Amino acid sequence: NGILLRQYARGEDKTPVRHKDIERDIKSIGNATTTPRDLVNNNDVKIIFTVLAESVSRRMRNLGLKGTTLSIYVRDKKLGSFVRQCKLESATNVSGEIIKSAMALFVINYDWKMPIRSLGLSVTDFDFDYCSQFDFSKTVEKREKLEKIDTAVDALKDRYGNYCIGRGTVLFDTKLSHFSPYDDHNIHPVSPL
């Protein structure tokens, strides 16, 4: 918008100045990566989704967030891409649940006509007032145990580095899995436009 740019250039911005302590609401947490080689099967995809989901869920736990919507991004070798999303059973920040849901969404939506070049994963629709409903199937208790395990793994990674502990899935191809979106995560400034 040319008029807006001209106003900014002249210093005519009339929006109120925000206080330095005011933070923006977080709307999503995600990571994406271009892989070092093309992905050719579901096992390759699971390795990448495992690394991405562990990073995303770790960042959500650090912020005390649980998300209810999962999105995946897939780009193939010829740079055709798509995004798909699904609602999760309940708000979660458990990496295993995110991996399982991402793989289920991927398997339903990709037919392997072409190798994959890039994958992404994000969680949105955060439940800030999370409370769980009473459940006879004990899924809430299972989720709490998994959250405690993930939190213990986070503490180990914080203390000894990202590669001190991990899921066995990522050991099938260390060339694919040897990246750390959690450590390499960059937050880019938001444009006023």
PLM feature spans:
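Acidic, metal-coordinating catalytic segment for phosphate/diphosphate chemistry
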Residues: 90-193
